[in-house]
Curated annotation (Swiss-Prot):
Belongs to the universal ribosomal protein uS5 family. Keywords: Ribonucleoprotein, Ribosomal protein, RNA-binding, rRNA-binding. With S4 and S12 plays an important role in translational accuracy. Located at the back of the 30S subunit body where it stabilizes the conformation of the head with respect to the body. Residues 11-74 form the S5 DRBM domain. It comes from Photorhabdus laumondii subsp. laumondii (strain DSM 15139 / CIP 105565 / TT01). This is Small ribosomal subunit protein uS5. The keyword Disulfide bond does not apply. The lineage of its organism: Bacteria, Pseudomonadati, Pseudomonadota, Gammaproteobacteria, Enterobacterales.
C-alpha cells in the first residue's frame, strides 16, 4: 500500500493503493497498473478516483483527475461527525461515530485517508467484512453521505434547529 500526500493549492491528495494487473492474450500477458486516490479540501469536500494505465505515474494522474471531478460535500461538526453512521458497498461495511476533541482519527487504511482529506479530525471508525481499498473508500463515502446535520433534519421536518436539538 503506497501513501503519497501532496497539497495542490488548497486540495490534499492522497494515494491509497497502486496495483499491478494483467490481461492474458494469445502472446502472453499485458501488464498495467491501477491507482486509487482521494482528494479533499480538509473542510468537508472529498472525492475519490480510480485510474488505470500502462505506467504507474499515468495511472496516478488519471486517478487524481477523476477524484477532483467527483468531489462531494459532506456535513461536518467542527472536525467530527454529527452522529454515528454506517455505510456499505458490496462486501465492505463501515461504522463511524463522533469522538471528543483530542481523540484523533482512529481508523484503518483506506478509511483513514478519506477521513483525513475530508477534514475529519476526531472519529472512531471500524471496517467490517472485506477490506478491499476500493470498496472501503466507497463504503466510507456512503456513510459520510448518509450523515445529516441538525439544519438538514430541521428543514426536512419543518421545525427549528432548537426543537430538533431539544
Amino acid at each position: 500500500m503506497a501513501h503519497i500526500e501532496k497539497q495542490a493549492g488548497e486540495l490534499q491528495e492522497k494515494l491509497i493503493a497502486v496495483n499491478r494487473v494483467s490481461k492474458t492474450v494469445k502472446g502472453g500477458r499485458i501488464f498495467s497498473f491501477t491507482a486509487l486516490t482521494v482528494v479533499g479540501d480538509g473542510n468537508g469536500r472529498v472525492g475519490f478516483g480510480y485510474g488505470k494505465a500502462r505506467e504507474v505515474p499515468a495511472a496516478i494522474q488519471k486517478a487524481m483527475e477523476k477524484a477532483r471531478r467527483n468531489m462531494k460535500t459532506v456535513a461536518l461538526n467542527s472536525g467530527t461527525l454529527y452522529h454515528p453512521v454506517k455505510g456499505a458497498h458490496t462486501g465492505s461495511r463501515v461504522f463511524m461515530q463522533p469522538a471528543h476533541e483530542g481523540t484523533g482519527i482512529i481508523a484503518g487504511g483506506a478509511m483513514r485517508a478519506v477521513l483525513e482529506v475530508a477534514g475529519v479530525r476526531n472519529v472512531l471508525a471500524k471496517t467490517y467484512g472485506s477490506t478491499n481499498p476500493i470498496n472501503v473508500v466507497r463504503a466510507t463515502l456512503d456513510a459520510l453521505d448518509s450523515m445529516k446535520s441538525p439544519e438538514m433534519v430541521a428543514a426536512k421536518r419543518g421545525k427549528s434547529v432548537e426543537e430538533i436539538l431539544g
